[in-house]
Regions:
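Low-complexity, prion-like intrinsically disordered regions of RNA granule-associated mRNA regulation factors
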Residues: 1-52
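Phosphate-end processing signature that detects enzymes handling 5′-triphosphorylated RNA
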Residues: 48-419
Length: 419
């Protein structure tokens, strides 16, 4: 029988098979010790040979990841005197999170506006800039201080704004998420503390959002067409660097084969600011990362990556768009495929801003889970360059940040995600 990868297998439509007998107690105990919630059984590939990184997102030491609503909470509900909007937590259908947790995440929703809560765009923009800029400067300083210059790596600061939905989840063994826990988290964030909330930023927006952004918003923002590209991103685990994942950005050659265009490590996050925009349909994330591009590769690494990529078969019928022949998903004990993305994007830009409208099809080989999404990302390229200066000036950065936030606020947050 021909081999079928996990993401192409489907349950049989014939009568269900008889229920197997339960395993003996000794075997059952052994299986429980290797459950997905156990460190021994989690994050392994190839029959348990490779301990994989448990988290694909890397936060730098000192990274601040916090959340706040806009308009902000009053110090206490009693202080609002009717001016604070009526808020509630509402279940939000989100398949990727539901598959992992078995429950719908929660979104903060304004049931009705308070007497003075709607505010103006100028008020919102000023509030975001004043809160974000001091921590941005501090985070950029920490990031540059942590650079360890290496001949084989090119490290860049990368400041982006993304649109999506802030979602909250209750963690096992902790109190349920409530308005009071959100109020406490927002208060902690005001003091510069890292939020203890278990939150996600869901970036999948409707097709209509991408279409309208391309047809109308680009013109209103005075952006020019930059490029349109298709890439396959092959994610590779290297046992010698177990805390990171190698990402090979690949293009399709004329003969249909893949060629490696760029090789990178995971991005490292230094500052994450999530904002629930209560009177908009979408929320806002501002984030500072470092990109780590590998300029030269160790011969063993280079040969392994080329072998893994050349073995890939483009198949539009599988999640992620690529599959590998049986036995070709790993190289010895050291290298193995852990994921693949197929992305198509259009980019528009001016001198200081680059807008990327991307459609992504992802497959995680560790969990056999796939996801398709539409994403809107604003790359603040002018500010990213300025932050690389030895001593960037806050006033000039504020003058660059506020117009971008205003454009995003007015043009990119008014697309409702319909379940």
């Amino acid at each position: 029988m021909a081999y079928l990868p996990p993401h192409k297998r489907h349950p049989s439509s014939t009568a269900s098979a008889p229920t197997p007998n339960p395993p003996p107690p000794s075997l059952s105990s052994s299986l429980r010790s290797l459950s997905l919630s156990s460190p021994r059984g989690r994050g392994r590939v190839g029959g348990g040979r490779h301990p994989l990184p448990s988290n694909k997102i890397i936060h730098a030491a000192g990274c601040i990841s916090r959340w706040s609503p806009l308009p902000p909470f009053f110090p206490s509900p009693e202080d609002s005197d009717g001016e604070e909007p009526t808020l509630r937590l509402e279940p939000f259908p989100c398949d990727p999170i539901e598959r992992k947790t078995g429950a719908k995440p929660l979104a903060l929703v304004a049931s009705s506006p308070g007497q003075g809560s709607s505010g103006s765009t100028a008020t919102a923009v000023t509030a975001i800039a004043e809160r974000f800029l001091p921590d941005l400067l501090a985070a950029a300083k920490r990031a540059k201080a942590s650079y360890a210059p290496k001949e084989e790596e090119l490290v860049k600061l990368n400041l982006v704004a993304r649109v999506g939905k802030v979602l909250f989840q209750t963690q096992p063994g902790r109190s349920p998420v409530s308005l009071e826990t959100l109020r406490q988290a927002a208060k902690a964030g005001e003091g510069g503390s890292k939020s203890q909330l278990h939150k996600s930023f869901y970036t999948n927006v409707p097709n209509e959002c991408l279409d309208d952004m391309e047809q109308s918003v680009v013109k209103r923002m005075a952006l020019e067409f930059d490029s349109s590209k298709e890439h396959y991103h092959v994610k590779v685990f290297d046992k010698h660097h177990s805390d990171s994942t190698i990402s090979c950005k690949c293009t399709v050659e004329e003969d249909g084969s893949l060629a490696i265009h760029k090789v990178e490590w995971n991005k490292v996050r230094h500052l994450v600011e999530d904002i629930s925009c209560l009177f908009k349909d979408l929320d806002l994330r501002l984030m500072l990362c470092t990109k780590r591009i590998l300029k030269t590769l160790d011969p063993e690494v280079e040969n392994a990556l080329k072998s893994l990529v050349s073995s890939a078969v483009i198949d539009p019928d599988v999640k992620g768009g690529l599959r590998w022949p049986l036995g070709k998903e790993s190289i010895g004990e050291r290298f193995s495929i852990v994921g693949v993305w197929h992305t198509n994007y259009k980019a528009f830009r001016n001198e200081t801003l680059r807008l990327k409208l991307r459609h992504g099809d992802r497959f995680d080989h560790q969990t056999s889970a796939g996801e398709v999404s539409n994403e809107v990302t604003f790359k603040l390229i002018g500010m990213s360059r300025r932050l690389e200066d030895v001593d960037p000036e806050e006033t000039s950065l504020k003058e660059m940040l506020e117009p971008v936030v205003q454009m995003v606020w007015d043009n990119a947050l008014n697309y409702k995600i319909v379940p």
